[in-house]
Structure formats: C-alpha cells, structure tokens
Amino acid sequence: MADATEKAEHDRIFKKFDANGDGKISAAELEEALKTLGSVTADDVKRMMAEIDTDGDGNISYQEFTDFAGANRGLMKDVAKIF
C-alpha cells in the first residue's frame, strides 16, 4: 500500500504522462514521456504497454499505472527524479 507521499508522486507522474488529461496514458503519450528519459524505440513502447496495460485496452489506466509503480518502486523513484 502506497503512503500519502508515494501516492502524491504517482499522481504527479501520471498527470505528466497523461498529456491530454483524459485519465489514461496512450502508447503515444507513453512514448513522448519515455523520450524524456532518453532514446526509446517503438519496440520499447510496445513492451512497456504490454507489461503495464494489463486489461489490454490499449491505454494505461491510473490503476494499472499505480499497480506497476507499486511493483517497481526503485524504478519509480528514478522516474520521479526526472519528472
């Protein structure tokens, strides 16, 4: 379970990734966000989408994002430093 600080970080990062503010992260939005972290290929984006988009609807919901973030705390700390 994420504490309040961790939840606030997840909220902040999710909003940065969700460029159009529709409450979900599309593959295009994920690609743009990942470009901030360095070079990213279309295959990288596909792999990340496949891993995070657990319901397979083509978008990353807030719940899917927080589930991934909770399982990958070290990675999310690194992402939080950049965003």
Swiss-Prot record:
Keywords: Calcium, Metal-binding, Repeat
InterPro entries: EF-hand-dom_pair, EF_Hand_1_Ca_BS, EF_hand_dom, EF_hand_pair_protein_CML-like
CDD domains to which the protein is assigned, alphabetical: EFh
Binding site for Ca(2+) 2: D53, D55, D57, N59, E64
Binding, Ca(2+) 1: D18, N20, D22, K24, E29
Domain EF-hand: 5-40, 43-75
Gene3D superfamilies associated with the record: EF-hand (1.10.238.10)
Gene Ontology CC, one term: cytoplasm
Statement: the UniProt record of this protein carries the keyword Metal-binding: yes
Origin: domain of life: Eukaryota
Function: Potential calcium sensor.
Protein name: Probable calcium-binding protein CML29
Organism: Arabidopsis thaliana (Mouse-ear cress)
Lineage: Eukaryota, Viridiplantae, Streptophyta, Embryophyta, Tracheophyta
This protein's encoding gene: CML29
